[in-house]
Amino acid sequence: MSPTQAKRILVVDDIEDNLSLLEAVLMEEGYEVDLAKNGELALAKIEASPPDLLLLDAMMPKMNGYEVTRRIRQNKRLPFIPILLITASEDANAAQGLDLGANDFIRKPIDFDELMARVKASLRLKDMMNSPQ
């Protein structure tokens, strides 16, 4: 992926180690990465400059990933942003995220090959939706 084609991904997680690890993996694949430590900061960043994709932890204090997803999908001023929720393996509410507008989810512990496949598929979908018919 050339620098002019680099897609920007916003990673949202309340755990610093998770942010650092995901940032390193995504940057190694050639993506531009922006980070947010909570849902409120993520919404502010999205409204200021919508990313190409959102990688969003489902369980965070104050505003969880489900609420962030709901607010993004209700905001008609925002362009389409693919949302991948990161859920704990025991999270029985993963389907709730899809119902609220998330496009996909991945369970912890994260398989990074699977993560990259899902990221690429979501970005392809966005490109197809944005291309002239």
What does each of the following model-derived ranges do?
Residues M1-L10, L123-K126, N130-Q133:
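Non-catalytic signal-transmission and effector/linker regions of two-component phosphorelay proteins
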Residues I15-D34:
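Two-component/phosphorelay signaling modules centered on CheY-like receiver
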Residues E23, E67, S89-D104, E114:
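Alpha4 helix (beta4-alpha4-beta5 surface) of REC/receiver domains from two-component response regulators
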Residues K37-L41, N64-R70:
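Acidic catalytic/metal-coordinating carboxylates
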Residues S49-L56:
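Active-site beta3 strand of CheY-like receiver
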Residues M60:
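Receiver (REC) domain active-site loop signature in two-component systems and cognate sites
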Residues I110-L123:
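C-terminal output helix
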